[in-house]
Amino acid sequence: MRIRIVTFGLNIPREAYAAHAEQIASGFAAWPGLLGKWWLGDTASGTFGGVYLFASRHDADRSRETDLFRGMFADPALGGVAVREYDVLEAPTAITAPASRG
């Protein structure tokens, strides 16, 4: 499995972002191999983003070719987009997050 963590600041009100996120959520759900996406928002620090869980590195790599992924970097509503990806350590994760075992 592969984890992606995306963070950014907002150049629009939080409420406008939340409404937009609801509108585009189904697009992320259609990504092959995406097991889940958690939407992040911390108004106090101004940090927003998401945590994505992919079935494989290949699935994570394929998602980078989508309009949704590329659009984050061109969207004037989002500032300072940062993307980090990590492999999941399968054995300890199976103990602490048994639902991820598949």
Which sequence ranges carry the predicted segments?
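Short, polar loop motifs at secondary-structure junctions
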Residues: L68
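Beta-strand acidic-aromatic groove motif in beta-rich domains, primarily in extracellular
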Residues: V51
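Short S/T/G/P-rich N-terminal loop/turn motif that feeds into the first structured element of a domain
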Residues: M1-F48, R57-E65, P76-G102
